[in-house]
Amino acid sequence: MSRNGRDACRELIGFFFTHDQSLTIYEYRQFGKNRTIVLPFIQKSIYSHQCGRRKGKQYRLGDFYVGATLTFLSSDHASLPESIKENTFLKLRITHIDQIALDSLKTASMDQEDDIVIQETNDRLVFKAIQDVLKEKLHKRGVRILTGLGKYFQQLDKEGNGLLDKADFKQALKVFHLEVSEKDFESAWLILDDNGNGKVDYGEFKRGIIGEMNEYRKSYVRKAFMKLDFNKTGSVPITNIRKCYCAKKHSQVISGHSTEEEIKSSFLETLKVACSKSDEVSYGEFEDYYEGLSIEIIDDEDFVTILRTPWGI
């Protein structure tokens, strides 16, 4: 989980060993068109959560499921890319899992940390209550608000570490007319500021109060971006997007209400407004666009079709 597009699109595979509760993670690296090798990313060892309610507790089988976030101290892993080591924590999102293997390993004797499970459930309820309040405000304006919010946070982030304070977030919500009650905001802040240092990653803040698309949808966003990012730099020139975006099968083109060029120009204009650089789009900005679009589309397959059709994935 990173604002750096190259890091966000890294292809990783991990293994958890129940006999000693250790884990290891490898990265797929492609060299040329046909050669792929697997390199160590996180060395095999026993690790603990670095953030959240489970901070300090060792990873266990129950921590692994689609959508789970694994956290590691970047300083513990000397071989990590410099772009990742710039951040205190390395955060990895589980996007796929071998469910058959997982189910076969689960046993009725697995001890449950009931107090933490209850706390995490309550945390989710706090966020859901806020998300429900904001859902109506985001309806039909999701793309504009999410892309605008992402750009606004980048401008506030003078140090470039992704961390902002409480006043920054309150101001951002006010600017984009996403105000929530003081009680709800403080409840969310207590959960998000788990280190108690008065600063929170703005990506975590957005995911908490607005929510995020599921991993199935997100996998197609990554596929589209990776197809555009020919050189794997983490940013895509607007010229690449113009070249690859196909509006031929867009509903408004088929109905005759718009031309292909009008749809393409409208899409590019929306992206440009969201970008910090006028001639390229970062992965975070690309994801913000589709995060906003996702809010307005209920059915997963409808969303995937909207992605697959113009990008040919």
UniProtKB/Swiss-Prot annotation:
Annotated Ca(2+) binding sites: 193, 195, 197, 199, 204
InterPro entries: Ca-bind_SignalingProt, EF-hand-dom_pair, EF_Hand_1_Ca_BS, EF_hand_dom
GO MF term set: calcium ion binding
Keywords assigned: Calcium, Metal-binding, Repeat
Transmembrane segments: none
Domain EF-hand, residue spans: 144-179, 180-215, 216-251
Pfam families per UniProt: EF-hand_7, PH_CAYP2
SMART domains (UniProt xref): EFh
Name by which UniProt lists this protein: Calcyphosin-2
